[in-house]
Amino acid sequence: MSVKILKILVCGLFFWSLNAHLWGKQDNSFLGVAERAYKIGNYSKAASYFKKACNDGVSEGCTQLGIIYENGQGTRIDYKKALEYYKTACQADDREGCFGLGGLYDEGLGTAQNYQEAIDAYAKACVLKHPESCYNLGIIYDRKIKGNADQAVTYYQKSCNFDMAKGCYVLGVAYEKGFLEVKQSNHKAVIYYLKACRLDDGQACRALGSLFENGDAELDEDFEVAFDYLQKACALNNSSGCASLGSMYMLGRYVKKDPQKAFNYFKQACDMGSAVSCSRMGFMYSQGDAVPKDLRKALDNYERGCDMGDEVGCFALAGMYYNMKDKENAIMIYDKGCKLGMKQACENLTKLRGY
């Protein structure tokens, strides 16, 4: 046999072995086929193979069928079928199945709302170390079944122990405000906020910033630390964090006054739904502060702030309409500002109406 032919045979054998190895690595079980189909959006094929897996006793297949029917992926939404498959999965100790089952009982989807059934399903998932199920138990005991504050704290704590940021954040709020029958302690609040912030919860970072800024952390005021936490909160799309940074730069509080940076932070916050930040942008446009003076943009931003419930924005907007001789709109918006609790808006409303 020539060397050339031998090389061809060796190469062929190598590639055959490689393909066989790769094929062997690929999961060709019903569940494996279903998962690959699901990833590429072929939901009908995925459902078919998840069902085969479920019928073979693979609990994850049952859970995935529940998800498909709950969300209407490749089929119409069918909460009753979702409930059936989640129940089967949960009976087989599948924590995601128990979580899904708890959610349907919690919301009353595909069945009558039943908090006890929801508690049972979530509790099983929580024991199986499913963080969100622990958190949802906290929510039920906190907000839906009154008189169970101690249970709420227990389950929020479990979710926090499993690194669920919002569980840690809620405990931080509880200790800061003295909610859920815990003894008020800013020191404990900081501990929980710190963990939640490290887990990238923007609300917790903002809360830390406020505590350090105001010296309420049972520590000395530390503006640099406060600023750092507010920056992180803003980077995590927390509108209050961005708004606080905007105020710092606008007033030159703890930082060098910088109207342009203030405007940029207010814009970020406004775009994320901070009513007061929209109103502050309106003021900056009305004064030509860091941006060219533009009364049209001032009016638009005051309107955004007012629409989102900022009484100062409503007051300023009404004043602009009054100056434009539009008494009807001025009255309507002063009325809104008055209802939002601004005394001066109420006084101006009385003057314009004459009563």
Describe the predicted segments one by one.
Residues 40, 76, 112, 144-146, ...:
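Structural motif corresponding to the intra-repeat A-B loop/turn of tetratricopeptide repeats
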Residues 30-37, 64-71, 100-107, 136-143, ...:
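Hydrophobic face of amphipathic alpha-helices that form TPR/SEL1-like repeat modules
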Residues 27, 336-355:
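Terminal, low-structured helical/coil segments at or just beyond the last alpha-helical repeat
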Residues 37-38, 42, 55-58, 71-73, ...:
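Short helix-capping/linker turns of helical repeat alpha-solenoids
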Residues 20-44, 48-49:
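N-terminal leader/linker segments that initiate helical-solenoid repeat arrays
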